[in-house]
Amino acid sequence: MYDGFGVDHIGIGVDNMERMKTFYQEVLGFGQLIASMPRKDHTVIHELQRTAPTIHDHIHFNQEVGGISIALFRSYEPVPRPIREDFRYGDIGLSKATIAVNDVERFYTEMKGGINFCSQPKHTTISEWGDYHFVYCRDPENNLVEFVSDANIKGKSKFGGMRSVGMSVTDLPRSISFYQKYLGFDKVVVKTHEKFSGLVDEISGGTNTQVRSCVLVNSKGGGMIELFEVMNPRGRSIPFSAIWGDFGYLQTCLYGYDIKYTEEYFKEKNLEFLLTPKVIDDPVYGGMSFLYVRDPDGAPIEFMTIPKP
């Protein structure tokens, strides 16, 4: 069985590193530096990008309160380009980051001068969760970010951490089965519902948007994952030409302790590998290792090891 945890971080390919760093660090409070890597040829991902050299730099940070963290990657070789010219809610793969705030309506009022909100604040009620208030913005490179508040979010700080990542899928039951069976998301936090239908037209590119969604978590720890299927208009598949390092949401990263066991487990279950296990070639990460597989829709999933406590 899968021997790991839930979501550790997400990766975003960026065009303008300084502009994106400023937005996430200074505007959204991701001021806790985890690590950074200089611009160089990272030989361990030649296999992932199927070329050489693979030159990029990156920075990895989080909000002070914790939660899912963010890694920004700026690729130089191979030359990157936007995954899409227009990112929409429902595009297949990693589609959004969901960040908790104390009060969505107040946050919207206070921050609309400095954040590019692309929806009005909305509200619905979800049976397992209760009142759910949300609003969407686009970061400086057009990626969707959701801000949420509800009775489960408490605290005095403006931000409550990135609570979940949103994966848009083509077949929700199939994806639920995959993430539960193979990736350890064994606990259902929110059962499948359609409460967001009709509330996300501003970001879906359509009208009367129909969507069904659920939230899963690994009971051993790590961040949550929202799986959602946009049934009308249908989500657009991952472009065939997209490569790792292109601009946009790149990957969801899970974590655990034993890379060899995980590799053998994924092989036994016939998961498709994008990258076989590699050791990170940077002393900052202390020899941690990682691999990549695909989910049923082709979205990249990274699994990386962390030191045992």
Predicted regions and their residues:
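Internal, hydrophobic cores of structured domains that mediate oligomerization or house catalytic pockets
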Residues: 136-148
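Loop-centered beta-sheet repeat module
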Residues: 145-173
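A cross-kingdom feature marking solvent-exposed beta-strand/loop segments within repeated
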Residues: 36-55, 77-95, 102, 113-114, ...
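Core segments of cupin and vicinal oxygen chelate
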Residues: 13-67, 128, 168-222, 261, ...
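Basic/polar N-terminal segments that are highly enriched at the extreme N-terminus
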Residues: 1-3, 309
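Vicinal oxygen chelate
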Residues: 5-15, 55-76, 81-110, 132-138, ...
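Short hydrophobic beta-strand motif reused across regulatory alpha/beta modules
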Residues: 145-148, 225, 301-304
